[in-house]
Amino acid sequence: MEVRYKRKVDLCFRPPRTVRAELSRPYGILFSNNAKLLSYLGQFERIITVGDVVTSLVTRSGIRPFLSVVDGKTRRNVSISGERSSEVITNEAGILRFSAMSKIKEIMYGREPRSLFVNGEDDMMVIPIILYGKNGDLVVYGQPNAGAVCLENWEGSRWRVMDIFSKFTAELC
């Protein structure tokens, strides 16, 4: 008889207080005009959206993101959006779970468009999307009280995100 112990362990990566200010600033082009944002998106083949408002705006305009990530909340309040996502992941506020990063890696290396619903908070999902994305991907995420940020993925953006992520501390969830 063979016995295997398959304990499932998840790591949580937490940013130090000094990095939180870095995470709150926009990286990329900030759009406060929806028409200009949607026009800009036309230049890109693979678009990834993070956030309920941005995802709703993009999909209502007829653009199908390669990956859309939502958490059912807008500014920490429950959203009125009824959109259902195909897969659910868990990621609590203020952290980045290894399991969430692994799911995003799987999707970003795949070929099929997908959507994720985050049980928790979607803000940190931009980090693995940039780390595992392809050159030329466009990540669109909401910037509270300002608009939407478009960040094109390339070696420089990956380097910057990796620099920020390297300052996180890991702990068991």
UniProtKB/Swiss-Prot annotation:
Source domain of life: Archaea
EC id: 2.7.1.237
Pathway stated in the Swiss-Prot or TrEMBL entry: Cofactor biosynthesis; coenzyme A biosynthesis
Residues annotated to bind GTP: D52, V53, V54, D71, K73, D122
Pfam short name (any one): DUF359
A GO MF term: kinase activity
Signal sequence coordinates: none
Function, in words: Catalyzes the GTP-dependent phosphorylation of the 3'-hydroxyl group of dephosphocoenzyme A to form coenzyme A (CoA).
Family, as annotated: Belongs to the GTP-dependent DPCK family.
Name used for this protein in its record: GTP-dependent dephospho-CoA kinase
